[in-house]
Amino acid sequence: MAKQGALSALSNGGLSELWARLRFLFLAIIVYRIGAHIPVPGINPDRLAALFRQNEGTILSLFNMFSGGALERMSIFALGIMPYISASIIMQLMTAISPQLEQLKKEGESGRRKISQYTRYGTVVLALVQAIGMSVGLGSQGVAFSNDFGFYFVAVTTFVAGAMFMMWLGEQITERGVGNGISMLIFAGIVAGLPRAIGQSFESARQGDINIFALIGVGLLAVAIIAFVVFIERGQRRIAVHYAKRQQGRKVFAAQTSHLPLKVNMAGVIPAIFASSILLFPASLGSWFGQSEGLGWLQDVAQAIAPGQPLNILLFTAGIVFFCFFYTALMFNPKDVAENLKKSGAFIPGIRPGEQSARYIDGVLTRLTMFGALYMTAVCLLPQFLVVAAHVPFYLGGTSLLIVVVVVMDFMAQVQSHLVSHQYESLMKKANLKGYGSGMLR
């Protein structure tokens, strides 16, 4: 009886960590959603609503989607997580081209902490630039009640503090919750806006502004995209690997056959988020500073890279392709994999171990990455054309669907991993307790 109680306590203790992580995740999302509804002092809500009605369907809609609706409320989280994402992109690019940062990255945990510290400094700088631009834009367009230094100081301080809190919250979710914190915050913002967008679509269809058949077609397209994304994200290219017969001491290991799994889309949803962030930064500057005297060309730039424009499509496609290859290269090194296979006595049939195996794996990975980049571009851009043509809210775009589906799949995979890990630990502890009990009987 005592032994069964001990086993039950061990099992419950294992699952309690998962429940604690889930509770922290939900609490963090609740805090994020509460903050998204706290407005910055000194904002005229009527003028703000009129401003967003004028800019409906522009790049601001995408910016508002990533901020979870905080931008249109001009809340303390209006900048969202984009300054941190932009700083992360810059730091990763600099790490790839700077020998000093590359060496710092190889120093282990201390080096990674140093790079994270540099990323935070970059986040402060970018958030400050965007906060100043947003505050000046609000003042020049009459959205602020009083266009004085007091408003600018309070607004800039609030925006920067909100962006830094979002960065901290995302890091805490990654460390103490489940899933990638940044992706979870973006996911929460998109999902929070979906009910409103769907309700507006049905209301527009009821009033005759949208063809009901077009709305049904968009809904079926969304279901098809979700199924397609799940199919591709679960897809793998398996490279056959053989282990030769070997002997270690007195033990003889028979020849074995295994495989090296390579995901079709190894970069996940990161390229879509990074490419969107690259477009959002200059577009946001153009939207806020474009009204100022002598800076009208910035507004022309913002209009040129608005959703549906040829330049937007070209830059977005180039960004996705670049970040697919860049992020895959950061995550997976064919030379290291080939070297590890050689050290373990494994080889790819028909391929010489070492350099030839590395070139073969790199070739397979390049083809997979190109297919993954084309798949992600199609998912993000094709629905955008149909959504714009049917005048459906931007929330139903391909980028948002891709982020939602991939984040949910990653979340479920991590929960399953925690469950399997705890079951394994429970079995091992159970075996140890049985061995201890039989020893006591002797």
Swiss-Prot record:
Cell compartments where the protein resides: Cell inner membrane
Keywords: Cell inner membrane, Cell membrane, Membrane, Protein transport, Translocation, Transmembrane, Transmembrane helix, Transport
One GO CC term on file: plasma membrane
Topological category with respect to the lipid bilayer: Multi-pass membrane protein
A GO molecular-function annotation: protein transmembrane transporter activity
TM annotation in the entry: 24-44, 76-96, 125-145, 149-169, 178-198, 212-232, 269-289, 312-332, 363-383, 385-405
Stored Pfam families: SecY (PF00344)
Keyword NAD: no
Entry's family note: Belongs to the SecY/SEC61-alpha family.
NCBIfam families: 3a0501s007
Function description: The central subunit of the protein translocation channel SecYEG. Consists of two halves formed by TMs 1-5 and 6-10. These two domains form a lateral gate at the front which open onto the bilayer between TMs 2 and 7, and are clamped together by SecE at the back. The channel is closed by both a pore ring composed of hydrophobic SecY resides and a short helix (helix 2A) on the extracellular side of the membrane which forms a plug. The plug probably moves laterally to allow the channel to open. The ring and the pore may move independently.
Subunit comment: Component of the Sec protein translocase complex. Heterotrimer consisting of SecY, SecE and SecG subunits. The heterotrimers can form oligomers, although 1 heterotrimer is thought to be able to translocate proteins. Interacts with the ribosome. Interacts with SecDF, and other proteins may be involved. Interacts with SecA.
Protein name, UniProt field: Protein translocase subunit SecY
